[in-house]
């Protein structure tokens, strides 16, 4: 039977519960255990699909088409286990399911209440489908004290009593701020956070304390005394130089040993961490540097591109170089010449996005890369803008544009109205809802034999990648674009939807309709990112 680890947060948000959960999952995995990670999000949205990137950050898409929290990306990258739609749920989804059942009459006239109906739904979600796992790590979003989170805290409180003895452990992630004027770490915020947690019936078994310095023994003793935990269970979560150093740092601090002790499990074998040590060796001792310009719309909120940042880092790890990122707001290029901003970079990446704001700037970035032979990687929207640039400046279609921005005489990019998902036909219309209506999840693509992208994938002629888009390049313009050098080197297996474009006579210019960053791992860098960084290394010698 699976054992459950519940990770909560206190004092402030954005402490890194997702990373802590992922790192602990990796440590347990390194000891030979089979782990599953799940996220409970207290907000009322059904999913983060329609939320602003400025508020929520990246939307992480799974193979089965779920739009989920970015923490699931950490889970995948650290454990290698693909997440599914069953690994993330929101208050909105729970309420929707309950109300649907109530309208159907499933509750036989009962008064629907938070306790027991909402809490039971949360417990059912947490417990479902875990028979094949040794440990299930469940992260509760937000911080203790948030009104939205109360049903989730009540549910995990009940679960400890529902499960057999020694089958549930609570870890509370908190902050120990350092006050320079006093010259000491302050424990009072953590004490109050634990007091709040205990007031709703949850006694943490382990305190994971974020800090930028060593925790003095006296402060550990104080935290153990006033928070009612063993002194050995006060774990120091020191800041590290890169996120892939977190598993080893937490192991050295004793987190995984303390978790096993809390379950009454004798430590069998130490975790095998050599692969993590090798990753960190490459991160800390690069053999060179490259600079990549990210020309995007949400550059003020780096979390909007979380998986992208990590995938570029993985490309650097694969090539033993440090990848420096130059963030550029694409709107700038609508007013200014891109050259002064881009002449020094070794590669240009235009990521996914939505809407007209900044689109012309992205088109100009693609033009600069094409004309100056700078490696270019266009992802989703970035591919579409590269195609529009080619249509305007190579083919001579001056009015080439996307119907996403309004009516146009030359719709190079248009709304997908239907596509195949397996053997089923999916249909959409302009008047449809925004939420959950995109082409989402893993879809296959057929690659042209001998094309550059096929070579990047090791000679493969069919791949599967994750998508998140509702607009698509119009194949009616395919022949004219190919006559001017822009090759459609990847299509959906039925030949209807363009997936990949490339220039054969360019050092490295590839646009993809999918999101390869979602499948990149530190131990398995995505081939497109590894190849892109390799091309940037070559370009760096020419600057």
UniProtKB/Swiss-Prot annotation:
Gene Ontology biological-process entries: 'de novo' CTP biosynthetic process; CTP biosynthetic process; pyrimidine nucleobase biosynthetic process
EC identifiers of the protein: 6.3.4.2
Disulfide bond sites: none
GO cellular component, one term: cytosol
Keywords: ATP-binding, Glutamine amidotransferase, Ligase, Magnesium, Metal-binding, Nucleotide-binding, Pyrimidine biosynthesis
GO MF, one example: CTP synthase activity
Keyword Glycoprotein applies: no
Binding annotation for L-glutamine: 54, 353, 381-384, 404, 470
Oligomeric form and interacting partners: Homotetramer.
Misc note: CTPSs have evolved a hybrid strategy for distinguishing between UTP and CTP. The overlapping regions of the product feedback inhibitory and substrate sites recognize a common feature in both compounds, the triphosphate moiety. To differentiate isosteric substrate and product pyrimidine rings, an additional pocket far from the expected kinase/ligase catalytic site, specifically recognizes the cytosine and ribose portions of the product inhibitor.
NCBIfam families named among the record's database cross-references: PRK05380.1, PyrG
The name this protein goes by in its record: CTP synthase
Organism: Bradyrhizobium diazoefficiens (strain JCM 10833 / BCRC 13528 / IAM 13628 / NBRC 14792 / USDA 110)
Gene giving rise to this polypeptide: pyrG
């Amino acid at each position: 039977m699976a054992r459950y680890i519940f990770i909560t947060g206190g004092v402030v948000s954005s402490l890194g519960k997702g990373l802590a959960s992922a790192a602990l999952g990796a440590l347990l995995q390194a000891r030979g255990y089979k782990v599953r990670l799940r996220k409970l999000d207290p907000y009322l949205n059904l999913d983060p699909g329609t939320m602003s990137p400025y508020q929520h950050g990246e939307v992480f898409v799974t193979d089965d088409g779920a739009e989920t929290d970015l923490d699931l990306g950490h889970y995948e990258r650290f454990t290698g286990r693909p997440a599914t739609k069953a690994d993330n749920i929101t208050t909105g989804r729970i309420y929707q399911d309950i109300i649907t059942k109530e309208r159907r009459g499933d509750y036989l006239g009962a008064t629907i209440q938070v306790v027991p109906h909402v809490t039971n739904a949360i417990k059912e979600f947490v417990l479902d489908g875990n028979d094949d796992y040794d440990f299930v790590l469940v992260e509760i979003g937000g911080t203790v004290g948030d009104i939205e989170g109360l049903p989730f805290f009540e549910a995990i409180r009940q679960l400890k009593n529902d499960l057999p003895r020694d089958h549930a452990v609570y870890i509370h992630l908190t902050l120990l701020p350092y006050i320079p004027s006093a010259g000491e770490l302050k424990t009072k915020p953590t004490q109050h956070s634990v007091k709040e947690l205990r007031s709703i019936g949850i006694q943490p078994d382990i305190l994971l304390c974020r800090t930028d310095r060593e925790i003095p023994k006296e402060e550990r003793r104080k935290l153990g005394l006033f928070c009612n935990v063993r002194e050995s269970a006060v774990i120091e979560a020191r800041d590290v130089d890169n996120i892939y150093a977190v598993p080893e740092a937490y192991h050295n601090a004793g987190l995984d040993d303390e978790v096993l002790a809390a379950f009454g499990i004798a430590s069998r074998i130490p975790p095998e961490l050599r692969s993590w040590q090798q990753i960190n060796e490459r991160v800390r001792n690069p053999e060179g540097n490259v600079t990549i310009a990210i020309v995007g719309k949400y550059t003020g909120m780096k979390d909007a591109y979380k998986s992208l940042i990590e995938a570029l880092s993985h490309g650097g790890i694969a090539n033993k170089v440090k990848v420096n990122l130059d963030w550029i707001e694409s709107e700038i290029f609508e007013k200014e010449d891109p050259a002064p901003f881009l002449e020094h970079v070794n590669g240009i990446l235009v990521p996914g996005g939505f809407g007209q704001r900044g689109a012309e700037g992205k088109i100009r970035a693609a033009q600069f890369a094409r004309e100056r032979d700078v490696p270019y990687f266009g992802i989703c929207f970035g591919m579409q803008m590269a195609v529009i640039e080619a249509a305007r400046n190579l083919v001579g279609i001056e009015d080439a544009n996307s119907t996403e921005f309004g009516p146009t005489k030359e719709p190079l990019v248009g709304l997908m109205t239907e596509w195949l998902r397996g053997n089923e036909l999916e249909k959409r219309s302009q008047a449809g809802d925004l939420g959950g209506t995109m082409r989402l999840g893993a879809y296959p693509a057929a690659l042209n034999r001998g094309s550059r992208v096929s070579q990047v994938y090791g000679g493969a002629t069919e791949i599967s990648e994750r998508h998140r888009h509702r607009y698509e390049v119009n194949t009616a313009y395919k022949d004219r674009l190919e006559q001017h050098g822009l090759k459609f080197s990847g299509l959906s297996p039925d030949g209807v939807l363009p997936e990949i474009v490339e220039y054969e006579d360019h050092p490295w210019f590839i646009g993809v309709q999918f999101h390869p960053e979602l499948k990149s791992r530190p131990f398995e860098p995505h081939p497109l990112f590894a190849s892109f960084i390799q091309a940037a290394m070559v370009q760096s010698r020419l600057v």
